[in-house]
């Protein structure tokens, strides 16, 4: 196989790794493109294992980009939420091989937000172990740490993530039903109906990035969240909404004309909504919402 064919064979895995590491489609695409440029300039005779070479290069480029992004986000206005890979109106009814890996791993907005709690090396070590099934020797080579240190990184990451994850997730049917009811209540501005769906200490996290109006701090408490949607409806600022999918996860898609205005996902704990995540920053929203997932996206 020539260099381009080899690279395209491994590209879905590289994109999946870069996206989980960075939580940004644009940044992940840049990292994978940089990996391609380095691969196309490498001497094929000196590369014994192309996949290992590409994964190593992508991991190290991704870590460099993540460190830079963390410094840049100090100046980001309000909460930072992940930029989606795929926003669709319908799920893929028959996932192909390129999606099987993605569907087995969590790329929900909630989980990507949780990953932001980890340091760059912790995040890389955890993902390489848990999402991509590398052993500790391989992880040590990939991120430039000792095996013992990598074990500690993964252990700490597991502890931190476990503390932030719900003990009992809703099944897919319950999750979608709650989301549909939340969409209906929020479109009507029915504060009481919204509060009935939420945990008392629920939070709403909105990402406008300083580009559009959005809360610059998480809104805490079911009553305050209910009042917010009541106020939005009273002002006549409600946008047409329908259920769709973000990274394969059910989501509320709101439109302004033909343009996606925002999307909202939820996290369900013990039968009620614990967290609401809304991305309004137009720089993170696709220009076109497709009907089905692109197989190579996730």
PLM regions with names:
Residues 105, 242-244, 254:
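Short acidic-hydrophobic surface loop/beta-edge motif
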Residues 250-257:
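Short beta-strand segments that buttress and anchor functional surface loops
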């Amino acid at each position: 196989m020539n260099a381009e064919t080899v690279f395209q064979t491994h590209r879905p895995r590289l994109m999946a790794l870069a996206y989980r590491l960075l939580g940004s489609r644009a940044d992940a695409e840049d990292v994978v493109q940089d990996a391609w440029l380095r691969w196309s300039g490498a001497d094929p005779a000196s590369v014994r294992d192309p996949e290992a070479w590409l994964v190593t290069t992508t991991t190290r480029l991704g870590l460099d980009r993540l460190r830079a992004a963390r410094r840049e986000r100090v100046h980001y206005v309000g909460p930072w939420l992940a930029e989606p890979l795929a926003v669709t109106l319908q799920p893929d009814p028959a996932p192909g091989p390129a999606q099987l890996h993605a569907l087995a791993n969590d790329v929900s907005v909630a989980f990507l937000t949780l990953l932001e709690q980890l340091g760059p090396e912790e995040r890389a070590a955890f993902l390489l172990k848990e999402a991509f099934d590398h052993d500790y020797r391989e992880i040590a080579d990939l991120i430039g740490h000792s095996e013992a240190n990598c074990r500690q990184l993964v252990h700490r990451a597991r502890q931190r993530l476990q503390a932030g994850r719900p003990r009992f997730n809703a099944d897919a049917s319950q999750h979608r039903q709650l989301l549909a009811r939340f969409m209906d209540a929020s479109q009507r501005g029915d504060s009481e109906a919204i509060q009935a769906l939420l945990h008392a200490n629920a939070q709403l996290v909105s990402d406008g990035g300083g580009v559009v109006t959005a809360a610059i701090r998480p809104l805490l408490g079911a009553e305050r969240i209910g009042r917010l949607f009541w106020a939005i409806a009273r002002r006549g600022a409600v946008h047409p909404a329908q259920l769709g999918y973000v990274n394969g996860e059910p989501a509320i898609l709101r439109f302004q004309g033909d343009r996606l205005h925002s999307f909202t996902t939820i996290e369900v704990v013990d039968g009620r909504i614990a967290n609401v995540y809304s991305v309004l920053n137009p720089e993170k929203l696709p220009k076109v919402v497709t009907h089905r997932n692109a197989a190579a996206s996730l």
